[in-house]
């Protein structure tokens, strides 16, 4: 299959996800936003046959009910809410939408490890900005840069 790939991906470093422990009996895995617990009994009761039937169908591609609910909850307009199939898809859309002519993305040196991968995929330059000694971000490091700035809040994996 790789012989059909675009040459622009030849030097792309594959993404390596964080540690995926095998023995989960004594651990609660938190690094991939998975819930280690079963659904609450109230959730199980709320699922009825009609909803189970809907599980075989594609969801609304515009996510209208979800966007409406989130906009109402946060008191913002629908045009201020974006929904996607997980954070990686949303990030891909954001990289496409906000890539500047300079082609640079600035983000903390210690942050989400997929940012450099997206930079490679979209032909952008990844500029890693050092953190302060206490792992916090110095906003002045980003003043006047010629590209898109990514500030994750809270920053992963530092939590700051």
Q: What do these predicted regions represent?
A:
Residues 1-57, 144-145, 150:
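N-terminal "arm"/small-domain region of PLP-dependent enzymes with the aminotransferase-like
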Residues 55-160:
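Conserved core of the PLP fold type I
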């Amino acid at each position: 299959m790789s012989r059909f790939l675009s040459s622009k991906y030849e030097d792309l470093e594959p993404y390596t996800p964080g540690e995926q422990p095998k023995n989960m009996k004594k651990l609660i895995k938190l690094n991939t936003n998975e819930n280690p617990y079963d659904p609450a009994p109230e959730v199980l009761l709320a699922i009825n046959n009609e909803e189970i039937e809907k599980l075989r169908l594609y969801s609304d591609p515009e996510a209208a009910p979800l966007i409406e609910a989130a906009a109402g909850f946060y008191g913002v307009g629908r045009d201020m809410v974006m929904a996607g199939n997980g954070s990686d898809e949303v990030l891909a859309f954001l990289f496409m939408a906000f890539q500047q002519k300079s082609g640079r993305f600035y983000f903390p040196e210690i942050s989400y490890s997929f940012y450099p991968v997206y930079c490679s995929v979209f032909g952008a330059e990844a500029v890693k900005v050092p953190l302060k000694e206490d792992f916090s971000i110095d906003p002045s490091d980003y003043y006047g840069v010629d590209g898109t700035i990514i500030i994750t809040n809270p920053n992963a994996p530092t939590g700051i």
